[in-house]
Amino acid sequence: MKDVILLVEDNVDDQELTLRALRKNNVTTEVVTVNDGVEALDFLFGTGRYANDPNRPVPRVVLLDLKLPRLGGIDVLRRLRADVRTKWLPVVIFTSSREDQDIIDGYRFGATSYVRKPVLYTEFLEAVRELGLYWIMRNERPPHAKDDA
């Protein structure tokens, strides 16, 4: 199955900036973008508008914003970790939040990593490049996670 990054981001400007940063850094992996927490869960669990898509890929990594409409990032994370199908899925919180409590909650509920979105364009490009290369090119999933996917 092909490698996919799931970007869960409601801000259109941040979506485009992330996609542009990946392209600019030659991370050619397909990126599926969803706009809120409910749509993220629908994609990952094959429900809602994704219910009849047998070719829906399992992402190599989820880049998850925290402040999302309908269902926040922490609630998405809690549901992913509670389900055997997604408990091993790498979830990187990728957010502009600088709140200590968000970092604590992210790790408490099973985030693989917490990355603050840099404000400066060049730093943002570098952060996205590093995330894309690490999770697609370097990271090895546990064998059972590959079987569960």
Predicted segments — roles?
Residues 49-52, 74-87:
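Short amphipathic alpha-helix used as the core "switch/output" element in two-component signaling
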Residues 16-20, 75, 98-113, 119, ...:
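Alpha4 helix (beta4-alpha4-beta5 surface) of REC/receiver domains from two-component response regulators
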Residues 33, 68-71:
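Residue-level signal for the "D+5" position in two-component response regulator receiver
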Residues 28-35, 41-44:
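Short hydrophobic/Thr-rich beta-strand motif most characteristic of the beta2 strand and flanking loop
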Residues 39, 119-132, 140-145:
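C-terminal output helix
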